[in-house]
Amino acid sequence: MRKINFSAGPSTLPLEILEQAQKELCDYQGRGYSIMEISHRTKVFEEVHFGAQEKAKKLYGLNDDYEVLFLQGGASLQFAMIPMNLALNGVCEYANTGVWTKKAIKEAQILGVNVKTVASSEESNFNHIPRVEFRDNADYAYICSNNTIYGTQYQNYPKTKTPLIVDASSDFFSRKVDFSNIALFYGGVQKNAGISGLSCIFIRKDMLERSKNKQIPSMLNYLTHAENQSLFNTPPTFAIYMFNLEMDWLLNQGGLDKVHEKNSQKAAMLYECIDLSNGFYKGHADKKDRSLMNVSFNIAKNKDLEPLFVKEAEEAGMIGLKGHRILGGIRASIYNALNLDQIKTLCEFMKEFQGKYA
């Protein structure tokens, strides 16, 4: 029997995708070989590669103004590639909403970029999304869409005339997005859209001009990968294959509007369970900024019970509920692949646990 996996990433995958990958692992489409064994230059793999890119654009409703790049190095490499490629001679503005924006700021500073933190919620242990106004003449404005550790999420992105950069790693492909002022939108795919080893970057083509004539190593230059259709070097072929299956699955769900509707229902059920616990459970994030993806909470009346909660949950068939080491507590990551019945199972366990130990 499969466990209910609430891990923050790598995370649970739809069973249909795992079963299809299992079926095709040794014999892809009856061809007598695995997709992992063939050259990335073959037509067979190119169909997967380019098909995945087109499906990703279709899900977000993007036209040819955007390039889709498949890169390695995780989202963390983007912390350096973004300022390397997109910083000009002005100020790069960041909103600091958690660990991942702090890391991005640090990488830009290492590169000698003129970085300004224009908003931060660090003084309240990142329990909310701070109000932010970016200057129109900044080189770019940078935000993290969803904060995996602290359980906060932008309900709407800031409106700005300067190019907006969005790290969407932990709410990738979970809802429709207004791209009207987004210049670069990226994430590692291992939370909501595949397995580890692949990053997907949507970059507006006019931004690629900034990479021209810069002294950047070829592998770190967005233009290199755009001009070579993300095939400059050997890509992570199996991760791209799995990403392609995820794109098919999302389209079969009815697209991102339907996925968002389901995600909203799941989150509402879990937050209601916390809010109606008479203070036994307490969420970390302010209600207005609660994440639909990561629900971080404590056993407020006795935090010593939290390891027992995790242990008993595992015995009941639920894994990945231990909070991040920085924040502690309990965290349920309720990504796309989890269904409403699985959230209901968690809520029933939470009520039973409260009944035993309140």
Curated annotation (Swiss-Prot):
It is found in: Cytoplasm. Pathway: Amino-acid biosynthesis; L-serine biosynthesis; L-serine from 3-phospho-D-glycerate: step 2/3; Cofactor biosynthesis; pyridoxine 5'-phosphate biosynthesis; pyridoxine 5'-phosphate from D-erythrose 4-phosphate: step 3/5. It holds the Pfam family Aminotran_5. The modification N6-(pyridoxal phosphate)lysine is found at residue 191. It is an enzyme of class 2 (transferase). L-glutamate binds at residue 41. One of its GO terms (molecular function) is pyridoxal phosphate binding. Keywords: Amino-acid biosynthesis, Aminotransferase, Cytoplasm, Pyridoxal phosphate, Pyridoxine biosynthesis, Serine biosynthesis, Transferase. Catalyzes the reversible conversion of 3-phosphohydroxypyruvate to phosphoserine and of 3-hydroxy-2-oxo-4-phosphonooxybutanoate to phosphohydroxythreonine. This is Phosphoserine aminotransferase. The lineage of its organism: Bacteria, Pseudomonadati, Campylobacterota, Epsilonproteobacteria, Campylobacterales.
